[in-house]
Amino acid sequence: MLQDQLREIRTQLRMAMNGITSTSMREKGIIYKLNFGVPLPEIKQIAATHEPGSELAAALWKEDIREFKILASMLQPADDFPFDQAKQWVKEIPYLEIAEQCSRNLFCKLPYVDNLLLGLIFNVEDEYARTVAYLIWAELFKEGKTVVAPVRAAFIVECMRSIAWPDFGATWKEKQAAVKAMKFYGRQSADHARQMLSGFDEFPEFMETPEGQEIYNDLKFEFEYYS
């Protein structure tokens, strides 16, 4: 049964494959054992033809195939995904696209999302841990959801650590994810927007840099536009 499902998915992906996209991704350094280059809307359509299940999702995830990993995030039931398995998936994320899809399709829906966020944001060992935390926050805030006080406090402090601490060494993708989450948080209310912008007051040296000015002005424009 499982092998039949995997064969059917491979067939569906071959029929939808886009060689130009997969070649372009490979040229940009995104290298999988197999990449069909299938666009996300079509991957969603394929996912809709299969029953979600942990066994199928696990089998898809373990393969070094771009579309399999994305489908795994779509087909894994959130209520049957242990905490340790979530942490393991984060360790195994190969590229930003997979981090984004896991955060959007699965991680933000987990019943223990607050605990997962605290574990990820203080994890500096795994390449994508902090980035995934910000991506999850972005999804939650975009939907107008709130998080418990300790998680919110960690979010506010760690955003500025990622963005403004020169010695922290945050990656570009981590900074971008942090800014994205800050935008959705600030959109929720005027108080939230002020919280985000006031954080820059503690980093006057960063505010004198072109990067600091660009991020601050980007956030300010965002909050004024949505106010």
Label every PLM stretch briefly.
Residues M1-S227:
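Alpha-helical scaffold domains
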